[in-house]
Regions:
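Cross-family detector of peptidyl-prolyl cis-trans isomerase
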Residues: 12-149
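Intrinsically disordered, low-complexity segments enriched in small polar residues
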Residues: 3-7, 17-18
Length: 149
């Protein structure tokens, strides 16, 4: 399903803890699966692994997340809040993070876990980031929404 924001696919899971989605330990670092042998996506893709039941992340609110990020090209982790032992907070829709995060976290509910695949144009583009993320890299994140204020 395409939209003007470039989202081509949104998959929804059943609510957390239901019979079709086993209760996960949301206080553990998730695995991030990066497709192998497939070309990278050029659209934002959102896959809800767990649908939260709490407050919704909307533009203008401050969100608190835990996340793991990997590069599509090599499957290597480049960042994870879990490894630092602290969550990350930012103002949603305020341009404090890459566009793919602003668009990808919006609509999540507290307690949710979402895989967000971000094309270069919504990530770091041709410049890359700090020698850790290469130019024109597609990024794959698993994000847990911890809180909304």
């Amino acid at each position: 399903m395409a939209s003007s924001s470039g989202v081509v696919r949104v998959r929804m899971a059943a609510p957390y803890g239901t019979a079709t989605v086993p209760a996960m330990t949301m206080n553990e670092k998730p695995e991030v699966d990066v497709p192998t042998g497939e070309p990278p996506t050029y659209h934002l893709e959102l896959d809800d692994i767990v649908v939260g039941a709490g407050d919704e992340a909307v533009a203008g609110r401050t969100v608190e997340v835990h996340y793991v990020g990997k590069a599509w090209s090599n499957g290597e982790q480049f960042d994870a809040s879990w490894d630092r032992g602290s969550t990350f907070k930012f103002g949603l829709g305020k341009g404090q993070v890459i566009q793919g995060w602003d668009q990808g976290v919006a609509g999540m509910k507290v307690g949710g876990r979402r895989r967000i695949t971000i094309p270069p144009m919504l990530g770091y583009g041709k410049r890359g980031a700090g020698g850790v993320i290469g130019p024109d890299e597609t990024l794959v994140f698993v994000v847990d929404l911890i809180g909304v204020k």
